[in-house]
Amino acid sequence: MAEENKILVTHFVLTGLTDHPGLQAPLFLVFLVIYLITLVGNLGLMALIWKDPHLHTPIYLFLGSLAFADACTSSSVTSKMLINFLSKNHMLSMAKCATQFYFFGSNATTECFLLVVMAYDRYVAICNPLLYPVVMSNSLCTQFIGISYFIGFLHSAIHVGLLFRLTFCRSNIIHYFYCEILQLFKISCTNPTVNILLIFIFSAFIQVFTFMTLIVSYSYILSAILKKKSEKGRSKAFSTCSAHLLSVSLFYGTLFFMYVSSRSGSAADQAKMYSLFYTIIIPLLNPFIYSLRNKEVIDALRRIMKK
C-alpha cells in the first residue's frame, strides 16, 4: 500500500550556492561578469583563430576546439545559475535536468581528450620537429578533434540513458547549483548501484588513461628539452609547453581535490567550491592562459585590429 501512495517526482529544485536572499543579487552580478568574460575570451579566441590564416595550424585548431568546449561547459551550468539567482522558481524538469548534465558531461569529457591530443602535438613538435609537418597534418588534427567530441558525447549519452531507469519519489530537492548526476542518485527511489558503478568505471578509465598519457608525453618532452644544448632552445621549448602544462595542472588538480574531498567526507560546501572552480573558473582562465604570453596569438590580434 505504501508503494502505491508514493508520488513520482518529475521536477527538481536546485538549491544553488546559497539560499540567503541578500546574496542573490550580488552573486548574480559576479557570475554574470564571469560568464560574459568567459564567453568573450573563448569565442573571441575561436574567432581569431578562424579569421587569421597564420593560426590555421594543428595546435591552434586544437586550441579553438578547447575554447569551444570551455564555452559550452560554462554555458551549460552558468546560464541556469544566473536565472535562479533572480527567479523564485528554481524548478527544473527531468528532461531539462538530464539535458544540462548531458552537455556539461560531454564537454568535460571532450576536454580531457583534447588536452591529451594537444600534449601529443607538443610531443611531436619538440621531440620530432622535422617530422612535425608530416605527422601533424590539419586533416589528422580534425580527426583527433572529431574523435574527442564523439567520445565525450557517447560517454554522457550512456549515463543519461541509464538515468531514465531510475524513479524519484523521496525528494525533489537537489542540494547543488546544477544537475550533477551523483546528486540525483542520492534522491532516487530505485537502487542506483548499477549507475554508480558504471560512472566509476568509465570516469576512472577516462581520467586515469588521459592523465597517464599526459604524464608519459611530458616525460618525453622534458627529456628532449633537457637534451638541448642551447639555453635559448630550451627556453623556447619550455615556453611552448608552459600554458598547456598550467591548464592541465588546473584541470586535473581540481579533479584530484574533488575526489579527495568526496572520499574524506568533507563538507558539502567545500565540495561545491571545488566543483564551482572546475565548471566555471577553469573555462574563464583557459583562453587567457593560452593567449596572454602567446606571441602568435597577440600578433594575430594586432593584425586584425589594424584592419
UniProtKB/Swiss-Prot annotation:
Coiled coil: none annotated. The chain crosses the membrane at residues 29-49, 57-77, 100-120, 144-164, 196-216, 240-260, 272-292. Keywords: Cell membrane, Disulfide bond, G-protein coupled receptor, Membrane, Olfaction, Receptor, Sensory transduction, Transducer, Transmembrane, Transmembrane helix. It is found in: Cell membrane. Gene3D superfamilies: Rhodopsin 7-helix transmembrane proteins (1.20.1070.10). It is a multi-pass membrane protein. Disulfide bonds join 97-179. Residues 50-56, 121-143, 217-239, 293-307 are cytoplasmic. One of its GO terms (molecular function) is odorant binding. The keyword Disulfide bond applies. GO terms for cellular component: plasma membrane. It comes from the Eukaryota. Residues 1-28, 78-99, 165-195, 261-271 are extracellular. PANTHER family: OLFACTORY RECEPTOR. Odorant receptor. Belongs to the G-protein coupled receptor 1 family. This is Olfactory receptor 5AC1.
